[in-house]
Amino acid sequence: EFGVGGVGSTFRGIALTAALVILIGAGVLYGFGFSDIPDRSERLWASLFHSISAYNNAGFGLWSDSLERYHDNVLVNAVVMVLIVMGGLGWRVTSDLASQGLRRRRRRLSLHTRLVLRTTVLLVVFGALGLALTEWLNRGEVFIGMPWPERWMTALFESVTARTAGFTTVPFSLENITDSGTLLLMTLMFIGASPGGTGGGIKTTTVAALMAATRSTLRGR
């Protein structure tokens, strides 16, 4: 899809997309998410640092408790999740989606984009529901005392960040999470992000291909 002659334009597209997404994320965090930080220069540094870290799926934080102090902050959770997902999707997917939105006549998304989007949504939902089942039903310590909306937000956040980043809004450890919850998080980490994305793992497309092959085998095709 991208020839050798288009390496320069592709590189510029990747750099501009990353810069735009990171700056928007940092702007939202600075203006609203990290509003509890009184010093403006410190708030700006924290906003830029965490926006870059989230988009690149690095998971590095400025505080020893990661993002636990913002466990009930919907905006911080949402912005970090969006940055993680966008970085994990890869430029090829975001470029395809952007060009689709700019076209007057809609065309079908590429097979790669459709495969990545479907698998990503499936994994995020699977991870969130899996954590809800493994921790709530087994009375894991992580969600004790949380109101229900915060429980769902935490489960969704941990499902997103476990695959590729590493941020956390709750004190996860082997002592306060169930064995089934640990296995679920390890599975998500093993799968990771998508090809061309900023995360690691065996990639979402590999999992999608394995699932398709398994389904075909079971159907005798």
Regions found by a protein language model. Give the residues of each.
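Membrane-proximal intracellular helices of multi-pass ion channels
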Residues: 1-221
